[in-house]
Amino acid sequence: MLTKVTAVCLLALGLSRPVFSQTNPDIQKVLDRLDTLEAENRKLLDEIHELRNELIERNTEGLDVQENRTAELDQSKVGTSQKLPITLTGMLLFNAFDNGKHSGTAQDPTSAALNAAPAFSGASLRQTVLGLKFNGPDLPGGGKASGQFYMDFFAGTSSPLNNLLRIRIATVDLNWKNFTLTLGQDKPIISPREPTSLAQVGVSPLTGAGNLWDWAPQVRLQQRFSFGENTGLLAQAGVYQTAESYPGTQPVEYSGTLERVRPGYQGRFEFFHGSENRRIEIAPGFHFSTTHVARQSVPSQIVSLDWLFRPTSVFEFTGEFFHGQNVAGLGARQGFDILPSEMVVPVHSQGEWAQISVFAAARLSFHAYAGEQHDRASDVAPGGVTRNFVYAGNLMYKLAPNVVAAFEASQARTQYLGSLLRLNNHYDLALAYLF
């Protein structure tokens, strides 16, 4: 900023000769204007200093508040320094349903009951799912820990005041670039897929009709191989704990001899090609274990094949096929039969299911699926099921990004040995709030 003396000197040097002829009053006017400008500049500087001090005070107050808030959060945490970040997820699901006379009084029958009962309708929230997801710390070798834990209220009874919490799926994944070790509870390794439904969530859709679904403890290894940018192989192997069940058609005196859980050994090899919108996956698999009952060993042997075919983003075809013997330990129907000679024989079974999905719009999708399990009649005791066939169709509409309405109609057609075919219709209207 120029002082008055400096300004006058510069003015004198820069003026031409005619200027010097100006009167003293003219020079005085210039000096007065310079005084005014200097005063205004000082005023501006004072205002700038005041604003700067104000900002410093505000920042200090903000930091104090943030530090106090951080201290409060630290006090509210109990040992969280060793825990993993947790995310709450799940689905609040309301179902209104209507059943036929052969539902067996179940909300979501998986087969048609042998004996008729009064048809009934109702509503329920017991298929609501609560979940926790976490992404954890780094592991040696560039790995990462993650996991999931899902529960529902399908245990207990259908009474609204007796819907008990239970574990559905719970896994811990130790992931590296091309390798994953998983420990927890999940579907069988050989049967990762299932139909899309909001009507049947408490148990997997098509249970006992081609879908091996039983959530059970297991340890699995997965190795990933890449053959190109969008082509590769997922090789999986592990130990799966079977849930052995005693058929109601068998002699009661042998029920106490059944070993309820057994180790099963499974493998699956998924070949894939394509991107998210256009993709094909096909995966053969195997399972073998042994059931101990009536002081005898009954082999369980299964071969499987599952697939996904998505030629465009609006169409999808998925499914599964299995063939083997003594498949009950994976959530299927009867596994063995005890003959009058006290010899135990495995029930030979074949099952399959398939689903077609059409994503008509961003909010609207249609799903049609069907499946069956066929047990060899010569292996089944009188009164047992030889064939259970279920087909269904549903439409789903997103009322909002996280609110889904759905309507589904299905029919179960169950054939009992020595009896007529039984039919049961099921209708379901669902509203799901996803979080």
Model-derived segments and spans:
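Outer membrane beta-barrel
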Residues: 74-245, 261-266, 270-276, 308-323, ...
